[in-house]
């Protein structure tokens, strides 16, 4: 368990002294989890609720149009839309709408809170979910047109029995570095070539005692081509200028959020590359991109080409694919853009 050196009162006092940083940054500066910071305000604008996706998604569907946020250490993915079409599952669940498209892993949803905070102009309301270590898994932010009455009712009807501001969190598991089984590389290449669906890939590499990044390094050309980290900017710029539609995945071990469509407005700022489109924002720390791969996987509908970025620890930052939908197939255009991206210097 994490060493909780600060009481909830200590955390609130420190926060009052330093109100400007975002929750994640402030919690990191204090050496606590983000969920510990949120929990410290239970009874003071924060209500602890059941974190199971079945509960959270049922509530989310009553809120109307909201902003969905899923992030990892290097990338933030924000989509505006309505939660609907929820598909429950013990291992994996989904929200499938045109605007909000989520892959949910219920075992990671361990702590959840309804949060009300005074903002510059109005009270900001959100539903925030965290994993066992207190790291954010998924957040839902109400907008002006959201159903604020439904949210207020949730604070009364969904409140857990335990509303203590003190909470315990597990130690954060380290990121798994690239894992390669040298004696199984030939098997990897042969089995990879026989794939018929991209979802079979992780089962294959797990069976061979490897992981995603390890498999890319092991397989090499023509299945996986390492690109320069600078290729990420080139990719986004070319997608924006060409209007090519993509599926852009950003996630963590508890939730993956997907945007499908074109990228219209890029606004770089310092180390950040930002997509600032109506209904979709992306915030990417370019300086934390350490390794980039262009990957081909065979499927029944043709080759699925992706560009995938990793940080220095080996954690996946994002994936980009062409859109494979009938009548809206952008894969050839996407593949042409990827083929022109700069490879990593030899």
Show which residues each predicted segment covers:
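Hydrophobic, ordered structural segments
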Residues: 1-5, 15-17, 94, 101-202, ...
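An N-terminus-focused feature that recognizes amino-terminal "leader" regions
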Residues: 1-122, 346
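Short loop/beta submotifs within extracellular cysteine-rich repeat domains
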Residues: 75-76, 134-138, 256, 314-318
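N-terminal, charged amphipathic alpha-helical interaction modules
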Residues: 16-41, 181-226
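Short, low-complexity cationic-aromatic patches
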Residues: 59-61, 100-105, 117-125, 240, ...
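DNA polymerase processivity clamps
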Residues: 42-72, 224-254, 298-303
């Amino acid at each position: 368990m994490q060493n909780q050196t600060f009481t909830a009162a200590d955390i609130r006092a420190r926060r009052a002294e330093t109100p400007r940083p975002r929750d994640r940054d402030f919690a990191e500066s204090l050496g606590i989890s983000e969920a510990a910071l949120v929990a410290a305000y239970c009874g003071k604008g924060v209500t602890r609720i059941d974190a199971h996706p079945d509960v959270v998604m049922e509530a989310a569907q009553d809120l109307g149009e909201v902003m969905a946020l899923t992030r990892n250490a290097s990338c933030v993915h924000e989509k505006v839309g309505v939660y609907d079409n929820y598909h429950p599952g013990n291992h994996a669940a989904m929200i499938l709408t045109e605007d909000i498209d989520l892959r949910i892993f219920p075992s990671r949803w361990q702590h959840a809170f309804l949060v009300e905070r005074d903002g510059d102009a109005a009270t900001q309301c959100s539903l925030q979910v965290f994993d066992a270590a207190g790291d954010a898994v998924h957040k839902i932010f109400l907008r002006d047109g959201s159903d604020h009455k439904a949210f207020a009712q949730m604070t009364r009807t969904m409140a857990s029995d335990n509303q203590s501001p003190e909470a315990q969190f597990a130690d954060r598991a380290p990121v798994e570095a690239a894992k390669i089984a040298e004696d199984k590389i030939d098997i990897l290449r042969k089995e990879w070539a026989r794939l018929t669906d991209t979802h079979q890939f992780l089962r294959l590499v797990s069976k061979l005692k490897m992981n995603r990044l390890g498999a890319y390094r092991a397989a090499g050309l023509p299945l996986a081509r390492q690109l320069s980290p600078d290729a990420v900017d080139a990719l986004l710029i070319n997608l924006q200028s060409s209007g090519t539609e993509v599926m852009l995945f950003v996630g963590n071990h508890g939730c993956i959020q997907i945007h499908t469509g074109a990228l219209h407005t890029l606004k770089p700022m310092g180390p950040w590359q930002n997509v600032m489109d109506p209904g979709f924002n992306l915030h990417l720390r370019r300086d934390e991109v350490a390794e980039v791969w262009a990957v081909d996987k065979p499927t029944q509908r043709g080759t699925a080409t992706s560009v995938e970025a990793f940080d220095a620890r080996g954690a996946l930052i994002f994936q980009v694919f062409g859109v494979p939908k009938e009548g809206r197939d952008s894969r050839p255009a996407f593949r042409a853009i990827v083929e022109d991206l700069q490879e990593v210097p030899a």
